[in-house]
Amino acid sequence: EPVQGEAGVRELPAGYLEAARELTRTAGALLIVDEVQTGMGRSGAWMAHHLLAPGVVPDVVTLAKGLGGGIPIGAVVATGEAASLLGPGQHGTTFGGNPVACAAALAVIDTIRGQDLLGRVERLGSAWARELLAVDGVDEVRGRGLLIGVGLAAGLPPAGEIAATLAEHGFIVNAPRPDTIRLAPPFILSDDDASAFTTTLSEVLARALSEKAGS
């Protein structure tokens, strides 16, 4: 993954993908990039590796989640020699190429292009990250576009408890790590909704910090 979602929204170190490309080329192995969480515009580009390592061309890219816009679909995209490793009929799947899922994927691609959602995700993600970083109790904001990891300060309740409190206020987030809240909202998230979340997060963390100080 160019940005590791379950690890707390952490980017690969600079140069990592370039080194992986060189190692796999030397060994005659495939470089497979997992863009299931980060692909299809989530990072503000079609694929997160386009941002982190623009010169790297993977042999295989895996896609799902955002590709279908809510309709279940997964895809394996192969380039170059890797694309010829499987011939027709060598890999079967009962629902492979499902017409409804494929139509949904095409509609997603058309919508992202037609509504400039890549630009929208990049602009909103950058502005929102700055807002979140200014919240008392937030130590760090990581990620790209609208895949954001909010690193909580030491001494706060576990991120899972904070996420549960936010859910009570109408915001669905999750906590992949004990100190991290992960945000992955729809690309059509409004500026007002983003600001409303920031305000609520600030209130929730302020209450938690106050309770800690009084204990």
For every predicted segment, state its role.
Residues 1-215:
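Conserved N-terminal phosphate-binding loop of PLP-dependent enzymes in the Aspartate aminotransferase
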